């Protein structure tokens, strides 16, 4: 099993002209990505000798089990992405970074990550806090304009795999629903029901 962790917003529409000027040729397949990257490979350390990916400048970990890295990443990176995006969009915020820096939405994201999703994982708390703090720093990357609408594609299956397990675990452990995750689901439903923005107001285009 392997895991790749890297935020890849896709085609850099805003900067493509400057990029082509720098390259001195047209490349319509340019993909933007953050500098951070992690490649986790479930294999013995000896494999590193046969596959010295680090010599190519890649951040690769050879580990006995990929599972805890997968669970941590899906829960504390993908999970918040999935719920913050519709909440941000319906609030008139288009970029992940701006959502994190928003007075209200920023607190919402922090609550979902630290007070709800983190409580559902069985990994060392300090390790989880450090990972979550690093994720927030990545979300705030000033060089990457990550559109929330790109994250909102296929929101229902994303929520089912990234957030619903945490919601169920939280309910089982705490005896109550996690309000942030419930709000995220409500925002997804609102968006897919036809909720649109106009002059700062949320309108419905269908019943």
Model-found features: residue ranges?
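Substrate/ligand-engaging "lid" and interaction regions
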Residues: 1-206
């Amino acid at each position: 099993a392997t895991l790749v962790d890297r935020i890849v917003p896709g085609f850099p529409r805003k900067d493509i002209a400057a990029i082509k000027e720098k390259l001195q040729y047209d490349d319509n397949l340019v993909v933007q990505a953050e500098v951070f990257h992690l490649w986790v490979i479930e294999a013995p350390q000896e494999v590193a000798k046969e596959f010295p990916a680090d010599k190519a400048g890649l951040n690769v970990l050879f580990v006995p089990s990929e599972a805890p890295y997968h669970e941590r990443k899906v829960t504390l990176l993908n999970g918040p992405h999935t719920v913050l995006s519709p909440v941000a969009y319906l609030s008139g915020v288009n970029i992940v970074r701006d959502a994190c820096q928003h007075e209200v939405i920023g607190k919402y994201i922090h609550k979902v990550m630290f007070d709800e999703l983190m409580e559902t994982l069985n990994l060392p708390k300090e390790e989880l806090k450090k990972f979550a703090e690093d994720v927030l720093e990545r979300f705030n990357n000033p060089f990457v304009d990550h559109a929330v609408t790109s994250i909102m594609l296929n929101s229902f299956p994303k929520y089912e795999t990234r957030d619903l397990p945490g919601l169920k675990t939280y309910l089982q452990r705490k005896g109550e629903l996690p309000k942030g995750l419930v709000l995220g689901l409500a925002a997804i439903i609102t968006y897919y029901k036809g909720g649109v923005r106009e002059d700062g107001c949320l309108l419905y285009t269908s019943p």
